[in-house]
């Protein structure tokens, strides 16, 4: 819940940057998971949820524009 509030304060450009960072993080976590080195599997779900929230906000801001 706190993260969506943090994301809502950002503009479209910052959200796009945040989305790229989250996608990179998701890729790294998936690689760790595939190699069996992932110590905190809950992070995959958290990152996926954050990606969905950022994409929703980008779409929302696009519709308002």
Curated annotation (Swiss-Prot):
The keyword Nucleotidyltransferase does not apply. Keywords: Ribonucleoprotein, Ribosomal protein. InterPro entries: Ribosomal_protein_uL29, Ribosomal_uL29, Ribosomal_uL29_CS, Ribosomal_uL29_sf. One of its GO terms (biological process) is translation. It comes from the Bacteria. One of its GO terms (molecular function) is structural constituent of ribosome. GO terms for cellular component: cytosolic large ribosomal subunit. Pfam families: Ribosomal_L29. Disulfide bonds: none annotated. PANTHER family: 60S RIBOSOMAL PROTEIN L35/50S RIBOSOMAL PROTEIN L29 (PTHR10916), LARGE RIBOSOMAL SUBUNIT PROTEIN UL29C (PTHR10916:SF0). HAMAP family: Ribosomal_uL29. Belongs to the universal ribosomal protein uL29 family. This is Large ribosomal subunit protein uL29. It comes from Buchnera aphidicola subsp. Schizaphis graminum (strain Sg).
């Amino acid at each position: 819940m706190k993260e969506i509030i943090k994301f809502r304060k950002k503009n479209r450009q910052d959200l796009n940057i945040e989305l790229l960072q989250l996608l990179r993080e998701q890729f790294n976590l998936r690689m760790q998971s595939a190699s069996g080195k992932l110590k905190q599997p809950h992070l995959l779900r958290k990152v996926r949820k954050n990606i969905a929230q950022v994409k929703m906000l980008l779409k929302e801001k696009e519709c308002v524009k």
